[in-house]
Amino acid sequence: MRWPGLEKDPSYEVARRQMRRIPGVISFDLGTAERVGRFLTAASLVFAATSFGGVHTTADRRAQWGDDTSPGFVRLSCGIEDTADLLADLTAALDEA
């Protein structure tokens, strides 16, 4: 998982210097495009999107657009859903993937 709010993240020092608050975008790798597909199908609160401009939780599969990323790479932008509901949904979707 990548999130600039974690001290072990390579972007942590830059984020700490440049940001007052750390954004709600995290990245993780599920290994394969198939697992990403299963994750997105199972997640009922997450919408597949290429733009992070709304208030809902969205996920983007960068490899499908030709970006130089792993087929299992996902960027997740956390929305304003109830935290407990979102965590439960993401946990269940990851288990399903």
Language-model features, listed with the residues they occupy:
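N-proximal accessory regions
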Residues: 21, 31, 48-49, 55, ...
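Conserved small-domain helix->loop->beta segment predominantly found in fold-type I
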Residues: 1-43, 60-67
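A generic structural signal for well-ordered coil/turn residues at beta-strand boundaries
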Residues: 22-24, 53-55, 70-72
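Bulky hydrophobic/aromatic packing residues
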Residues: 11, 15, 52, 83-86
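PLP-dependent enzyme catalytic core of the Aspartate aminotransferase-like
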Residues: 57-97
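Short catalytic/ligand-gating loop segments at beta-alpha or beta-beta junctions
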Residues: 2-5, 51-55
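A common structural junction motif
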Residues: 41-54, 93-97
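Short, flexible coil/turn micro-motifs enriched in small/turn-prone residues
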Residues: 19, 48-49, 67, 74
